[in-house]
Regions:
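Mature, folded catalytic cores of secreted/periplasmic enzymes
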Residues: 5, 28-34, 54, 147, ...
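Non-catalytic terminal regions of proteins
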Residues: 86-200
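An active-site-proximal "capping" alpha-helix that borders the catalytic cofactor pocket
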Residues: 3-20
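Long, well-structured alpha-helical subdomains associated
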Residues: 15-118
Length: 200
């Protein structure tokens, strides 16, 4: 349970602070409402989209995926009294909509505090209960709907990305600048990582 809880702690920290007005003041975010796109995306992914990677009838076993469902499901359940996240069905398709972004941020903060408490105190039972209640099981009807909707799109369930590499520029043995280089393709990047970092 430790890995999923640590992933949740990290995500919750980011989710909570991405809505801080200081990020706009510093110019990191362009708009005070920019965080809302991330909140909506995170909830949608945690409650639905990510399950397209799992066979129907199976549980979530991967720590990152457990973390996302834990956060989204916990917030959905704990926000129901005030309809923080709404579940809507339109034309046979299910949608989750964030109705109150400020309240959702508050829920992220509450869950972050609880997970930090669990980790700091070593409260194994509380951690286990969070994971088993919110992070493992998938609603079979919703899961089937996600798989059917995703199949119609013809998309792969996983995506990859190419990372830039920052390379120092030297002159007379001194670093005078840095340049950004990109690998030719994803496979080349992964083979480079294998060659360079496999001993770690």
């Amino acid at each position: 349970f430790a890995s999923a809880l640590e992933e949740a702690r990290a995500d919750l920290f980011g989710l909570y602070y991405i809505a801080d007005p200081k990020l706009v003041e510093l110019g990191i975010l362009s708009d005070k409402d920019a965080y809302k796109a991330q909140y909506s995306n995170y909830i949608r992914n945690g409650l639905m989209v990510q399950t397209n990677r799992i066979e129907l009838g199976r549980q979530i076993t991967e720590a990152h995926m457990q973390n996302r469902q834990l956060i989204a499901m916990w917030c959905y359940e704990h926000g129901q009294k005030h309809n923080v996240i709404g579940k809507k069905v339109k034309n046979g398709k299910t949608y989750f909509v964030v109705n109150d972004f400020e309240a959702l941020r508050g829920l992220f903060g509450e869950l972050l505090a609880e997970i930090q408490r669990i980790k700091s105190e070593g409260d194994y039972e509380a951690g286990k209960n969070l994971i088993m209640r919110y992070a493992v099981d998938i609603d079979p009807e919703l899961h089937k709907e996600v798989l059917d909707r995703y199949a119609a799109l013809g998309l792969k369930p996983y995506g990859g990305f190419v990372n830039p590499e920052i390379v120092p520029v030297e002159k007379d043995g001194q670093i005078v600048d840095y340049k950004v280089e990109y690998p030719d393709d994803f496979l080349g990047q992964m083979l480079h990582y294998c060659h360079k970092y496999s001993v770690l």
